[in-house]
Amino acid sequence: MKVLALRHSVAQVYADTQVYTHDDTKDNYENAFLISNLTTHNILYLNYSTKTLEILNKSGIAAVEIQSLEELFTLIRCNFTYDYENNIIYLHDYSYYTNNEIRTDQHWVTKTDIEEYLLPGWKLTYVGYNGSDTRGHYNFSFTCQNAATDDDLIIEYIYSEALDFQNFMLKKIKERMTTSLPIARLSNRVFRDKLFPSLRKKYQHIVNVGPRNESMFTFLNFPSIKQFSNGPYLVKDTIKLKQERWLGKRVSQFDIGQYKNMMNVITTVYYYYNLYQKKPIIYMVGSAPSYWIYDVKQYSDFTFETWDPLDTPYSSIHHKELFFEKDVAKLRDNSILYIDIRTDRRNADWREWRKTVEEQTISNLKLAYQYLASGKSKVCCVKMTAMDLELPISAKLLHHPTTEIRSEFYLLLDIWDISNVKRFIPKGVLYSFINNIITENVFIQPPFKIKTSKNEYIVALYALSNDFNDRMNVINLINNQKQSLITVRINNTFKDEPKVGFKNIYDWTFLPTDFNTTDSIITSYDGCLGIFGLSISLASKPTGNNHLFILNGTDKYYKLDQFANHTGISRRSHQIRFSESATSYSGYIFRDLSNNNFNLIGTNIENSVSGHVYNALIYYRYNYSFDLKRWIYLHSIEKADIEGGKYYEHAPIELIYACRSAKEFALLQDDLTVLRYANEIERYIHKVYSITYADDPNYFIGIKFKHIPYKYDVKIPHLTFGVLFISDNMIPDVTRIIKDMKKELFEMDVTTSYTYMLSDGTYVANISGVLSTYFKMYNLFYKNQITFGQSRMFIPHITLSFSSRKTVRIETVKLKIDSIYLRKIRGDTVFDMSE
């Protein structure tokens, strides 16, 4: 949802939009809670409070102040990610298709012939990093840019088997126009760009697990972050390959040679980072015009020094000349060298050309060895061709996509490789590598060993759920790592499946109860965004590809109502009960009935079950931004840091009742996942709360009324306001609590409406209006370690007779309390209190 804050109402009516006017009788937190549970996507928030907007944004719900109709129209028609700390909005708006254009934020693409393969009459527009060049389109009170581009489709095309670019793009654009927006993927770059600078300020040692090409620009500014990926393809790994011939397959209709060069250099940079944790000078021989240098410099400041007879316009220092062996001495330490020398074929026949290429390959390799043989802190990436070669077994083979699969591949070498054992690799084996293997990731660092690290902050986004990881190792890492941000796939199945298929692999599934943590926030993507200064207009949907975001060691842990809080907890319930259910009271009715409380009069006002916990369980797929376990735990140890005003603290028994209702709901829905989740949450409540039951009580609290509107034959009709199991020396503590609650007890709005047979031989009158006070008293007794209440639900009633009588219904009557007392069962009154 998105909240657009206005000072005045607007005449225009918008679809899927609701107006909320700030309620001055409620505090900012309650207003935020009410807004978050509205069911439309767009909320026009009138007479707004900036504090309420802050609360919503911290909760991950985008809430923006609007100063003009132009701002309103722009934000209401599309989704966006909001950097609420810096007041920057990143639109995810593809309406530019109506201008017959596709967009890119990679400059090199604009220098290709891609426009020849677009839809008829369409053009390509460069919009800068994350759409920064579009800022000039919006003259708004906040900074605004459109981060939507088609780079994801262009890159997907490059790695796909498709060759016809126009048909590929047409299909993908149609898919984009007919399916739900993958909002998390679109905003992920914004998130990463906010996350890692934030972590870098706090933590000296950061580990990042499983980065992909989408992150290749983000980490250029963080050479000290230790990356873990799937490891490199080594020369020695070719032993598994069978020999093949030249394939000559075209990969892309438009020229992607620059993309290949960019990927080679960035791969080399990250390999260098892994060895030396600092930025290198980048030397490049050949590969002009290297327009992609512009893209790299948009993200991070590097020195590029290049040699090529052709112009290289974005190089820091360009030598418009050939590079020779003698020039190697000019190259300094703390550098990488990219050798991409290849003479043009011109009119040479293939035999003559093949001889030239092989000679050049040997020459290139010699340059690489010469560069690495002296000095320190060096890495080299060199162009090679498929031919009979002796290569170091530890050298890394690269084959990033290029326009055609021919004879070309690249070799990545460090200073240790050149002194390592060499192996003869036949030409046919290298052709097999070229024909069958694509380097899909610029990150070729070794795999992560799933174990805790005492002095490092571990980030593992979408990296550890794969079933080739041991599930218990992942759980143990999350349980024991002191500082981390780790995601795992949430169990969205209805049959409690332990793993689910994703693309061509399987992922383990998890619930929050799989983890035994007491210093972690477990939330959703949008809940995590709020913690790092971002919010989003489109919440996570239960697609089956959703992840739990688990933060260990965050300073936000105790701020219970600010981050990963209960905002939106009832939104799914509202959507269902106001549109599909038998009555809008269905949730209240079901919760009472499933706990054998059959007095439904005023059930929506006085419910015996925690609606928070119930909704958090049965609709966890929709509202798991709320960290239920943390909420339970912090209340159990009385360390919840509550900033808001009015805040209702549940008694632990209310939470148990909610679990019982959720379990019955799950059985009716045949939802085995909710059934397990509710059982495990109930066990967790019993674990963190020391709940004892007065199932064999020796004292009770009685409430006597001035007048009872029914006939009775018991001696003193009274409301048993809870039973206790206490020793006599605890009586002063019990009476103190009763006295402390005197005002609230006598101010209870106690009513009765009918009589009924509670059991065979027990005729009673119903009582309403006392439950909230009962649960408050329960909490006070619990905190004083006094056993109060039974394991079965408290059903307030007045016993009228121990014989069978017919039910009597009357107009609701308010009962006036005469006295409240503490009496020993089958004994004397030990305390009596009148108003």
Curated annotation (Swiss-Prot):
Select a single GO molecular function from the record's annotations and give it: mRNA 5'-cap (guanine-N7-)-methyltransferase activity
Keyword NADP attached: no
Could you tell me which residues belong to the region 2'-5'-phosphodiesterase activity? 693-835
PROSITE patterns recorded: SAM_MT56_VP3
Q: For this protein, what is the EC number?
A: 3.1.4.-, 2.7.7.50, 2.1.1.56
Q: Where is this region: GTase/RTPase activity?
A: 556-692
Kindly report the protein's main subcellular placement as a broad class: virion
Q: Give the span(s) annotated as N7-methyltransferase activity.
A: 171-245, 429-555
One biological process term in Gene Ontology: symbiont-mediated suppression of host innate immune response
Q: Does the keyword Lipid metabolism apply?
A: no
Please give the residue ranges the record annotates as the region 2'-O-methyltransferase activity.
Answer: 246-428
Query: Where along the chain is the active site annotated?
Result: 718, 720, 797, 799
Q: How does it assemble?
A: Interacts with VP1. Interacts with VP2.
What protein family is recorded?
Belongs to the rotavirus VP3 family.
Q: What is this protein called?
A: Protein VP3
